[in-house]
Amino acid sequence: MGLKLNKGSSIRLAKDDDNLSEVTIGCSWGEDGHNIDVDAMVFFSDDRSKYRLVDLVYYGNREEGRLYVKHYGDDTTGSNKQHASDNEVIFLRLDKIPERITSVAVVLNAYTGEKLSLVPNLRCRVYSGKPGEVQDVLGTFDINDKKSLTTTSVLVGYFEKDSVNEWSFRAVGEALKAHRVEQLKNVFNTPKNIDIQNDYNTGPVESKVTIWGFIKRLFS
């Protein structure tokens, strides 16, 4: 089952003090009766260059020869469990991710435009090993906070590489006010800024910060 993650929880991606090279993010949800098409996607960013978006992988832009990531397909109804309990699965080779990439955000997006609150039992788990070959479930995050599901997209969490090239995963569970792929790309690509006070109702803060700046503040 692994560690049950809450908002802000962080897990180190290592086993017996050795860094893991292969991890999988598996996301699951129930059938909703509304034919809502939920998509799992990952955004690769270079935060040493002010969080510039480097790569994006989702159902419409899968592995295409990349050595470090593979998206295992699109479940359009919530009824197609690909690997055990997962509807959509993304596999990462952490040791093959280009050095300049330091953050990998995991997002769930309702392609058909409905609020995610209509989708039951949203859950993501991080485990070591390839899809279908689970070694250890490292953490499971149930995304059931209604404030996180008021829009069509939610930032599930992110993988982050530190200064000594060790990776960790942090659960976030924050709603994103973006729907289409191009809108989501803008969220994760500076110099595009977001108005945190208006968009996220977090109270007085500096008027403009990047999405990554916002995330760091939540858990600093």
Located regions from the model:
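Intrinsic-disorder/low-complexity signal
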Residues: 1-219
